[in-house]
A protein has these predicted regions:
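Conserved acetyl-CoA-binding loop-helix of GNAT-fold acetyltransferases
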Residues: 107-121, 144-148
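Conserved acetyl-CoA-binding loop of GNAT-fold acetyltransferases
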Residues: 147-157
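A short, well-structured alpha-helix characteristic of acyl/acetyltransferase catalytic modules
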Residues: 1-6, 11-46
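C-terminal "cap" of GNAT-fold acetyltransferases
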Residues: 90-94, 129-132, 136-140, 156-176
Length: 176
């Protein structure tokens, strides 16, 4: 997927991509919104290796800006448990996650353009009815970005984060 100087390419099972992810997961501004802690190289490889496979249920794309990796974006079909958690009844619903790992490139539209590229793909090629993004409630820049992409706040919910702490999330949806 491509839009001018933004390219979304599949994450590769190689040292270069894993090392880039490790670099980004060392940034507090990144890991505090996703894993709640720094990840080691092996943890990153164990998490992302299955997502590099063609039949992955959670395809991950490296976001490249001017041919340089700057973040990742991924999607997955929402399962029944999460539909209940999010209070969504539609059948073909996908959840999107994104982060721009290069902090100097925050707030310049790359995230918005990347989300719009993936959204178009999911609506056009996967026949998505609804797209969902669920940022932490305190991640105001992400919420603003998603609103600029046409996502609207549906509700708030509490659930455990990746290390078991209860967190407040915002469920945002974009309909086709």
């Amino acid at each position: 997927m491509k839009d001018k100087n933004i390219t979304l390419r599949r994450l590769l099972d190689n040292d270069a991509d894993y090392k880039m992810l490790k670099k980004w997961y060392q940034e507090k501004e990144i890991y505090s919104h996703f894993e709640q802690r720094k990840l080691t190289y092996n943890e990153i490889k164990n998490k992302y290796l299955p997502r590099t496979l063609d039949n992955s249920l959670i395809p991950v794309f490296m976001i490249e800006h001017n041919n340089q990796p700057i973040g990742i974006i991924q999607y997955q079909l929402i399962n029944e448990d999460n539909k209940k958690l999010y209070n969504i009844n539609n059948d073909n619903c996908y959840e999107i996650d994104i982060f721009i790992g290069e902090l100097k490139l925050h707030n310049n539209g790359i995230g918005r353009r990347s989300i719009n590229l993936l959204s178009k793909y999911l609506f056009d090629k996967k026949n998505a009815d609804i797209l969902v993004m669920c940022p932490l409630k305190n991640n105001i820049p992400a919420i603003r970005c998603y609103e600029h992409c046409g996502f609207k706040i549906l509700n708030e919910f509490k659930t455990k984060d990746t290390i078991g702490n209860m967190q407040d999330f915002i469920c945002m949806i974009r309909e086709n």
